[in-house]
Amino acid sequence: MSRASLVELTNLCVICDDSRILVQDQVGSGVVFPGGHVEPGESMLDSVIREMREETGLLIEHPALCGLKDWMLEDGTRFIVALYRADRFSGTLRSSGEGRVFWVEREDFARLDTIWGMREVLRICDSADYSEMFYSEEKEGWVLLG
């Protein structure tokens, strides 16, 4: 019996600039950290660098993998988001068709209308205590693991 399963691979990145973090008001969704899908044949690292360039105009340097966010889709596919953090970048900030990007002070982040687990993502990217967040149907919410 095969243990292979369907997986959808994506990424997001918490870009930090001193006390500010970059967020995206994603069209039709709410506030998220920018990110996107991994293309066939592309490494996870290359994909997050490409996505940040496409969605924010910024070229991130040496993004650090902080952990994973994952859950099961109704069709049995496991959806995996690689969570990165970057403190070094260059370029000029610009929005894309994905949504408006803007800096927010960390202390103001909790007041934003974020979607599905973004506060937990920030906790993972800010702490070595956790390395994964999994959506548990049994617990009816996100579980931080580490």
Language-model segments: which ranges?
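Conserved Nudix-box catalytic region and its N-terminal flanking loop in Nudix hydrolases
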Residues: D17-E54, W142-G146
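A short coil-to-beta-strand element that immediately follows conserved catalytic motifs
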Residues: L59-G67
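Active-site-adjacent beta-strand/loop module that shapes the phosphate/pyrophosphate-binding cleft
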Residues: W71-T92, E120-R123, D129
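NUDIX/MutT-family hydrolases
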Residues: R94-D126, L144-G146
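Acidic/histidine-enriched, glycine/proline-rich intrinsically disordered or flexible terminal extensions
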Residues: S127-G146
